[in-house]
């Protein structure tokens, strides 16, 4: 169940959405980041308002003007890209996304003194060059994330997926927030997700699975099939696959939660 605050914002954002209609529909604008070139499909109508797809060189985002976060960030990870990323030092460049309408985007002030990290969905550590790294620091790719969650168990999940991608040769990865339950918070104008997920699909094994974790200081996480995850979040992440294919579980590595960014 999506929090009532999202529903209350839907009407206002719908008016804004019509004003920016030319910018809000970019069907399959960044197919290279998606399995079979097909982007996820939103099945929960409360989420499918004031959305805008943003395409960057190595990842794509579906942004919500209601939550002022991504609904997902999608990547096609390859061993070559990750080898390049490994040699790139981190340079922080957090910034608001000027491609989005001002009323629908997060600003740095929304996160200031909130106690939450600005949590990457497509991680900085996956970025193979400076421009892609800077792109990853857009707030359109961020959610308010529990600081210890972000720096420990989530960092462990990101690192495990990178290692797996190098071993497999390539993986498709979709990362995003989930807004579940009736007690969602806001920081500034940005809605804090209740959970986070990272879905992984291996073309070689023709199987997928996902990490699913509450957005709190925790070491606990679930491993779900893609079908199970889709049922929870209201998004068809891999629309080119059948439900039976989505039930086939990819073996994901267990996480060392001692990791720190």
List where the protein language model places each region.
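Domain-level detector for secreted/extracellular nuclease and nuclease-toxin modules, and
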Residues: 2-3, 16-261
């Amino acid at each position: 169940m999506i929090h009532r605050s999202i529903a209350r914002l839907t009407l206002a954002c719908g008016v804004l959405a019509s004003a920016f209609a030319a910018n809000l529909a970019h069907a399959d604008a960044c197919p290279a980041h998606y399995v079979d070139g097909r982007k996820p499909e939103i099945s929960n109508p409360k989420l499918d308002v004031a959305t805008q797809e943003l395409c960057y060189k190595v990842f794509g985002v579906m942004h919500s003007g209601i939550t002022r976060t991504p609904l997902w960030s999608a990547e096609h990870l390859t061993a070559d890209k990750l080898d390049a990323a490994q040699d790139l030092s981190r340079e922080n460049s957090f910034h608001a996304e000027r491609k989005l309408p001002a009323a629908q985007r997060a600003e740095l002030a929304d996160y200031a003194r909130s106690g939450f990290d600005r949590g990457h969905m497509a991680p900085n550590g996956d970025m193979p060059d400076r421009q892609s790294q800077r792109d990853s620091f857009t707030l359109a790719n961020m959610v308010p994330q529990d600081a210890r969650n972000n720096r420990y168990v989530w960092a462990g999940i990101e690192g495990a997926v990178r290692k797996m991608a190098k071993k497999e040769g390539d993986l498709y990865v979709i990362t995003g927030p989930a807004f579940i339950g009736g007690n969602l918070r806001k920081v500034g104008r940005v809605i804090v997700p209740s959970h986070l997920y990272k879905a992984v699909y291996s073309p070689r094994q023709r199987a997928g699975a996902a990490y699913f974790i509450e957005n709190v200081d925790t070491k606990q996480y679930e491993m779900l099939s893609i079908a199970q995850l889709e049922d929870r979040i209201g998004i068809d992440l891999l629309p080119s696959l059948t439900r039976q294919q989505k039930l086939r579980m990819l073996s994901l590595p267990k996480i060392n939660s001692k990791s720190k960014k």
